[in-house]
C-alpha cells in the first residue's frame, strides 16, 4: 500500500480530513487515467503563512497553513469554494505532471505541468464535489483569467506561452481543458492524456513538448471537432454564441432536461 501522511501543527486540524480525502481520491482517480502513483508514500508538510502556496516535489508537498490547514471552509455548503481539497488535488496532479512527464525548456512547457495538473484537479472536483462546487470553481478560474489578462499587453496562444503567464497556464487551462473534455467526451479526452503520458513517461534527450501533446490529443478527437483543438491551443478565439430558444422538460425525479438552440 501507499503510506499517506500529513505533518501539521497540533491545533491546525480543521481541514485534515478533506486534505487526506483529496490525497486518496487523487491517487485512485489519476492512477486510473495516467497510470499508477509511483512512490511508497506521499507526505504533506505544513509551513507558516509567511507565504501562501503549496509546491509538489516527488512524494512530498510543502503546504502553507494559509491555504489549507486554517482555512474556514464549510464542507456542507456547495457555494463555499473547497480550497483545501482543490489545492491538494492540484498538487497531487504534479506527481504525474511534471514528475513523470516533464516538458523541455521551450514555449508551452509550463502548460504541460500546471495546465494538466489544473485540469486534473477540476475533473476530480467535478467528480467528488458535484455541479454546484464545480460551477463555483469554474467561475473562480474565469475571474482569475480575466483579471490576469487585463494586465497583459497581448495574450499569447497556449502553444506560445513563455511560462510566466499564470492566468493562462493555470486559470485558462483549467477552464478550457475541462470544457474540451465535455465536448470531445471525458473518456476520449482522458484516453488521450493516458496515451500521452504512456508515450513520454520519464523521456528525455529530447524532452517532450506541447506540440506532441496536441498531436496525441488530435488522435482521439473526431474530425468534426478538430477545430476545437486549433482554436484552444493555437489561436485566441472568441465565440459569438447566443441562445435562440429554450425548452425544459421536467423529469419524474424533479430534475429537468433543458434543450437550447
Predicted segment positions?
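Hydrophobic alpha-helical and helix-loop surface patches within well-folded domains
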Residues: 6-255, 259-260
Amino acid at each position: 500500500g501507499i503510506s499517506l501522511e500529513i505533518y501539521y501543527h497540533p491545533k491546525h486540524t480543521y481541514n485534515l480530513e478533506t486534505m487526506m480525502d483529496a490525497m486518496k481520491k487523487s491517487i485512485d482517480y489519476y492512477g486510473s487515467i495516467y497510470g499508477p502513483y509511483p512512490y511508497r508514500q506521499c507526505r504533506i508538510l505544513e509551513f507558516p503563512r509567511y507565504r501562501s502556496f503549496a509546491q509538489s516535489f516527488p512524494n512530498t508537498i510543502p503546504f502553507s497553513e494559509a491555504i489549507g490547514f486554517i482555512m474556514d471552509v464549510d464542507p456542507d455548503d456547495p457555494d463555499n469554494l473547497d480550497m483545501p481539497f482543490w489545492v491538494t488535488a492540484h498538487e497531487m496532479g504534479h506527481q504525474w505532471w511534471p514528475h513523470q512527464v516533464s516538458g523541455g525548456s521551450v514555449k508551452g512547457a509550463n502548460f504541460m505541468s500546471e495546465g494538466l495538473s489544473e485540469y486534473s484537479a477540476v475533473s476530480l472536483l467535478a467528480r467528488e464535489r458535484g455541479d454546484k462546487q464545480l460551477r463555483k470553481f469554474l467561475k473562480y478560474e474565469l475571474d482569475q483569467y480575466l483579471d490576469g489578462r487585463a494586465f497583459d499587453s497581448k495574450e499569447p496562444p497556449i502553444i506560445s506561452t513563455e511560462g510566466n503567464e499564470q492566468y493562462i497556464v493555470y486559470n485558462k487551462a483549467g477552464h478550457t481543458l475541462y470544457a474540451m473534455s465535455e465536448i470531445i467526451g471525458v473518456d476520449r479526452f482522458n484516453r488521450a492524456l493516458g496515451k500521452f503520458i504512456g508515450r513520454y513517461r520519464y523521456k528525455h534527450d529530447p524532452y517532450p513538448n506541447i506540440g506532441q501533446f496536441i498531436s496525441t490529443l488530435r488522435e482521439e478527437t473526431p474530425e468534426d471537432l478538430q477545430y476545437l483543438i486549433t482554436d484552444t491551443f493555437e489561436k485566441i478565439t472568441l465565440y459569438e454564441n447566443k441562445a435562440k430558444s429554450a425548452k425544459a422538460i421536467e423529469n419524474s425525479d424533479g430534475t429537468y432536461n433543458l434543450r437550447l438552440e
